[in-house]
Amino acid sequence: AAMEVIESATQTIDVLFYIISDDDTGNHVVDALTEKARNGVKVRLLMDRLGTLRGPSKAVKALRKAGGEVLFFSPILQLPSSGHLNLRNHRKMIIADHARVFSGGMNIGEHYMSDHPHSDHWVDLAFTLEGQSVQTFCDVFRSDWEVACGEDVDHITTPAPTTAGNATVQLIPSGPDIVEDPLHDGIIRALHLAKTRIWIATPYFV
């Protein structure tokens, strides 16, 4: 599904992940981004510096050479020290043409995306999305990109897409810049509003 979203892009691809591993899966994804950049697609790749300490550096270098923009969120060795070593970005998303999204709990790597029956991989949830909620993903990516590059970027507002399905979707970002806890409030509200069914998918239930 992640590769399908990348391959569908004709104008822009925005990618944000905590981990992109230096393995067959990680290199395959970055190579696909590089090919898109060579073909004139605007590619922006944002990775967490700590999560990608062992990332596919050669493939990323090739992406930059092809015209792709690459930034790291919260570099570890940054002077003067900002004291934000534990400020990590765990978001995961691929946005194609501001119209389609791949997101969820998966990072990019064999441990997350391998379909080999004997592989030691995580069982994780991911989804693809089209419709009006995509704009919120675009806004979140733009905000994180601005933090990483230290300057404002042009805000791209896409025409409101037609409804792609009948699902109700709400993206709830969280972080130290958000004072309240909208995720907690949103979950409680959703539970109260449920009439026939409650499905919960989470790796942790503390």
List the model feature ranges, each with a label.
Residues 1-206:
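Charged, low-complexity intrinsically disordered terminal segments
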